[in-house]
């Protein structure tokens, strides 16, 4: 790094005390050249050309397209001076951000030279921003980002933040060879990464089954004889009192064709930020409750492989079922630390009665019972020592603002349009609650005036 911008970038790294791989300080041209010249990529090029009767030059051009699409160029000033500042403003306009650790000492014991990979549940497109924001002082995270963000200006923004794009559901072997070699390249160079094992946003609020592609790519880096580090997977659980895209996700669960366009999703977030900015100026700011992040106990890949020797040497059809055990362990660890914020707790309590009109006193009593049960399984209840009436008041502000529940006398009425959203939020903690209500589709029938149907369990993809 030379010149004024280079010196400013180095000062920023020291200011944030960030964990940044030297690999990120080189120009993207070097990474692209290394990836294009990879022997395994060349082998895949020859195979693809032969199988599809294409010239070597034609396939090479396709590889160059994939490389340009995948490889980012981190701009440190963009990430920290622009990205961090905007994240701080946006998140504080929308939420109260809470961070907790299951074993902070274990995270601090990870050797500095080892590779850290954050594995997160996927609740909202805001997940990227929340986790990057809370980790900014100490670590830069390179995300695997879906094709939804490949639209101007998001594509440029994410690439300047050091994130790389992946085509979900794209099965071409040539593409996956390029992607795998890129993931192995950044892992070998110690880049801190973040990915979502579920591979997509949760449409019904529940934790989804893990996908194995990126996990396999990261793990197989250890097969390189020159790679002498350990890889640590850190479980990260995220939850919100309000997911900005919740209604769109529910509709998409019912009909995949009802998925909003990329610009529509961006416009939704921008609308919420803009409206809250106006409220801030006019003194009427109404945040959307909590955005909570919990970090779990890290898992050492070396230790896991010691109990499953030779797994990574197996052919793919035998290797992936074994790696599924590691993925299941990650999801179990993530599920155990999902933050219990006021709205999911209140939603679970309301729906556990399976009726429309419920005495408020009974709801508060049920919330107390549920919180006790959550405590018994060591669940991460946000501000667990707060009195239940105060927890209800925080949840009630959101439920009333969104017209999900109304109060009449000493009773609470669950509105027809509110029930699917209550299910969506209760589902986020359903795996922690051994009670009848939030573990199954809550209501077999619905009032006819609702425009959102009862949530059915999302099918694995």
Task: List the model feature ranges, each with a label.
Residues 1-461:
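Membrane-interfacial terminal anchoring regions of lipid-handling membrane enzymes
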